Amino acid sequence: MASKTVLFNKHLESKAKMVDFHGWEMPINYGSQIEEHHAVRQDAGMFDVSHMTVVDVTGSDACAFLRKLLANDVAKLTVPGKALYGGMLDENAGIIDDLITYYLTDTHYRVVVNSATRDKDLAWINKQAAAFDVVVTERPELAMIAVQGPNAKAKAATVFSAEQNAAVEGMKPFFGVQSASLFIATTGYTGEAGYEIIVPETEAEALWQALLDAGVKPCGLGARDTLRLEAGMNLYGQDMDESINPLAANMGWTVAWEPSERDFIGRDALTAIKAAGTDKLVGLVMEEKGVLRHDMAVFFTDADGVEHQGVITSGSFSPTLGYSIAMARVPSGIGAIAEVEMRKKRVNVKVIAPSFVRNGKQAF
């Protein structure tokens, strides 16, 4: 039996088409994925992300534990509320999950992990926590609503209390603040400004309705996927998993190599991979007709005339750009042009850094 979020009935009220998403009954769209996508790029849309897993890490060793657990370094977080993104690696430097960590106090951090990886994440975190003076607490009583788009903050402001508006005023990206019952963070998965709001389940329906009344359009997983792909953001299980290291997933920037004495899990393996060289994740753009899709083969010829092959990890039509885009894992040495095999013929594609749209505009 699929799990339902606390907002399930609100989705049905808005005529959502529900699908099974890793054991959760979630809205794929509310009638038009394209309209929902454009709402986020041009105005404001919201997503039920209550299936995400919120974990609080507390205790005197909280910082030391997370410095061991994560490839990014939480010691960089010194201002309460500041967050960072990064990978949780196994000993072979494979990505167990990608996650966001918020620094609340020296003895309290909040970690948000993916829903599809919840069970293995919690098992891994608890196993590693045994050697530290920490308490790992899952927070299933919390729901989460993402409000995204150029007008998202203004529309959310009409719903927030005066105290909450004061708390978020001037807040930079990748920060979170607890104000009354809401934990409001300037994070997202769309390439637009906005908030991810962690709210007690008992208040989630009222918050969703208030945002609806403020003119925020409900958006499903379909639009969420095309938005995150345009923004060049990875989807766990598709663009990376435990067989992939962060350097091959465009996550090298999230690995904190300094200080060199910090012995995070997977460091030795990743050091060896870095020295040997690894595949990389690139963006592909195809301006002719057709749609680039997951698992299609990518071919290119290097400077020495040797042909290499890679694979598309995520691909879709881009509603913002009007043609197809993709992310692909390829051997290093790829140039500005490659070919993708479609319907038994090869089609030329442009190769770019994997970021296509930012703040509603073409990013390349």
From Swiss-Prot:
InterPro entries named among the record's database cross-references: GCS_T (IPR006223), GCS_T_bac (IPR022903), GCST_C (IPR013977), GCV_T_N (IPR006222), GcvT/YgfZ/DmdA (IPR028896), GcvT/YgfZ_C (IPR029043), TrmE/GcvT_dom1 (IPR027266)
Gene Ontology CC annotations of this record: cytosol; glycine cleavage complex
Any Pfam family matching the protein: GCV_T
Single Gene Ontology BP annotation: glycine decarboxylation via glycine cleavage system
Protein family (similarity comment): Belongs to the GcvT family.
HAMAP family in the record: GcvT
Job of this protein: The glycine cleavage system catalyzes the degradation of glycine.
NCBIfam families to which the protein is assigned, alphabetical: gcvT, PRK00389.1
SUBUNIT field: The glycine cleavage system is composed of four proteins: P, T, L and H.
Full protein name: Aminomethyltransferase
Native species: Shewanella frigidimarina (strain NCIMB 400)
Gene that produces this protein: gcvT
